[in-house]
């Protein structure tokens, strides 16, 4: 018989208490100290408590292997890209990830919004952009206290959620009043009922996050579930939880896998929500096996999108490089054209001439002369005069399309 969740077995008239004991007594089962009260019709049942556990079924082991195999593909292709293409690729993937994590919660943000925040302009999204930028720079948060969770939250949302008085945290560190999650008019989840409970459960979570004998991918999935179960804030819990998940993946797998999480979740919003709801159901008794399996499948979908994008753009860049080599251009002109081509292929944001000067170590005056020659041959076109911005021209664009 295929491995099924306890709720399904209950409706098939199995003795789920007996089946639960079999699963808990299995020597391969990971039993955590993380405790939940199951949720029925959006309300927690304080009278029932279960320790979260999971069983590493064969499909989970297969999915883990696939994630590490995909990560090797990602890093192999990425390492073949020139420096500028790498930078622009990470920046573009990060921007898309922020847009998607916002959109999952119904928060609309555009590439222009995120790009402006990235370029030091203070906006409502500056906090979340700066935090994701830290992931790309390898400055990965390690959390050791509930105070650090609150600080990260403030850093992300002080110019956004916390501007609204309704979202102000009225406890010592977190919310002190109940919060409910609704799907339309139906209540589907309630966070922990008091700040005391929130702090106690977050301390348990931090302890779990920092233990060494749990596989990092499994730990990331369990942490994500339990953080969202607690729901310590009035708003922003989903985005905060996915940010923590991205940190885990960036640290333990690779940066681009970490930055494709929300993209994949956005494509699987119904599945994502269902994973949470089913795990919290009373008849599933705190089993995380299917939540972990589902989240690993979502991670793989994000990786596959990254691999497809990298393969396509890497081939296009190789073709462009060979084309540029065949042109009768000076070394400087070829370098300028290749840099602009990298930016065109890997980024939707224009490259300012001032930035271009830094990449090729030329003065603005000398750059202007080379740009003039390239423009005369239709290899380069002017995008903006203030600030001065150029991109590849139609002649090269037609070659790449």
Predicted features along the sequence, with ranges:
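Glycine-rich, N-terminal phosphate-binding loop and its surrounding beta-alpha-beta segment
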Residues: 54-104
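C-terminal regulatory or interaction extensions
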Residues: 224-232, 242-401
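N-terminal membrane/targeting module of cytochrome P450s
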Residues: 1-74, 369, 381, 386-401
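Charged, amphipathic alpha-helical oligomerization/scaffolding segments
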Residues: 66-69, 73, 127, 204, ...
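Active-site core of Fic-domain adenylyltransferases
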Residues: 80, 87, 91-234, 242, ...
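Phosphate/pyrophosphate-binding active-site loops
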Residues: 2-50, 185-309
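Generic alpha-helical structural element
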Residues: 63, 83, 87, 121, ...
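Short amphipathic alpha-helical segments and their helix-coil junctions
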Residues: 70-82, 131-136, 203-209, 271-280, ...
